[in-house]
């Protein structure tokens, strides 16, 4: 860990204005009727499909900086979780399982038999549940700032559960910018001011009520018992300076999943899609291979660091190895 609060960044950033301009030129927007809400989504790029699931107090637009760097390699698909405003979602009757069904509805809408999935923060719980439910449809996944079990502390429950009754956007929340500055601003140091303003403004579009319900769903979900049954290769990404989802959550996923590896994003916090999009895109690009060439249980000799006799894959009982991650940055066993 670095004592210096300034975070390191890769050179040559694409500034938010350019990201937005490219998004408007190149991305295709759509709406998927899941039967529970009208899901807004966009697709951007060509190649193997990669679906992005965002975290709490966020929208699909947060992934634009990293997707701008991946669109030449993947058909990137990002969607916004139910917000309960003009999308028809009845959040009071929603359950975490419904979020997973919404993901499958998007698969059906886009004609996806298989796709990679990246789940960020709260979105990682949706990705994990989907991988457990239909492993044949998600051959590999990436969990950034993820968790399988994150019950809220009493004060967190008090502060978030009450938001379920509030209309309006996150941008209207009192003292929001002060809170964001305390938690996230250090990892934007050294970057142009417009990058931080994009983070504040784009996340401000999420709905207050949606955050309240997302907090309730997160508090009630416990996927730890399902982890050993998730046999697909999983890349865990943890920001070195992430105080929102501390390292213990990544370690628990690493210990519980059948075939996972951990990469620590040096200098990053909880929102590397804003602060370190070049690094994040590079790690994603190197980990993933086309779904048609990546069976759900890959060949052990090609993927394990310690292949054993009789091993049929990283998840088989005879295999003691883990999936090696051909990525830059700091890799940890």
Model-inferred region functions:
Residues 128, 132, 139-169:
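Flexible "cap/lid" loop of the alpha/beta hydrolase fold
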């Amino acid at each position: 860990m670095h004592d210096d609060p300034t975070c390191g960044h890769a050179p040559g950033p694409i500034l938010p204005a350019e990201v937005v301009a490219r998004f408007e030129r190149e991305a295709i927007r759509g709406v998927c009727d899941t039967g529970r809400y009208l899901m807004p989504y966009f697709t951007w790029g060509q190649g193997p499909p990669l679906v992005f699931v965002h975290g709490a107090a966020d929208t699909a637009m947060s992934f634009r900086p990293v997707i701008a760097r991946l669109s030449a390699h993947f058909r990137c698909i990002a969607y916004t979780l139910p917000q309960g405003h003009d999308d028809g979602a009845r959040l009071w009757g929603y359950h975490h399982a419904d979020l997973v069904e919404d993901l499958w509805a998007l698969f059906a809408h886009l004609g996806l038999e298989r796709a990679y999935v990246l789940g960020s923060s709260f979105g990682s719980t949706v990705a994990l549940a989907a991988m457990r439910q239909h492993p044949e449809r998600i051959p590999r996944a990436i969990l950034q700032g993820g968790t399988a079990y994150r019950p809220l502390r009493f004060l967190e429950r008090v502060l978030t559960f009450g938001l379920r009754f509030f209309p309006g956007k996150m941008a209207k929340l009192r003292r929001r910018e002060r809170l964001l500055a305390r938690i996230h601003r250090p990892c934007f140091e050294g970057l142009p001011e417009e990058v931080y303003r994009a983070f504040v403004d784009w996340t401000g579009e999420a709905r207050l009520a949606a955050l309240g319900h997302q907090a309730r769903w997160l508090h009630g979900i416990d996927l730890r018992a399902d982890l050993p049954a998730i046999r697909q290769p999983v890349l865990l990404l943890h920001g070195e300076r992430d105080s929102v989802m501390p390292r213990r959550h990544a370690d628990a996923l690493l210990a519980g999943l059948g075939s996972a590896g951990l990469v620590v994003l040096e200098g990053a916090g909880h929102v590397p899609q804003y602060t370190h999009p070049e690094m994040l895109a590079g790690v994603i690009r190197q980990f993933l291979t086309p779904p048609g060439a990546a069976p759900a249980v890959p060949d052990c000799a090609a993927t394990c660091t310690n292949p054993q006799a009789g091993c049929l894959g990283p998840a088989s009982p005879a295999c003691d190895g883990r999936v090696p991650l051909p990525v830059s940055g700091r890799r940890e066993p």
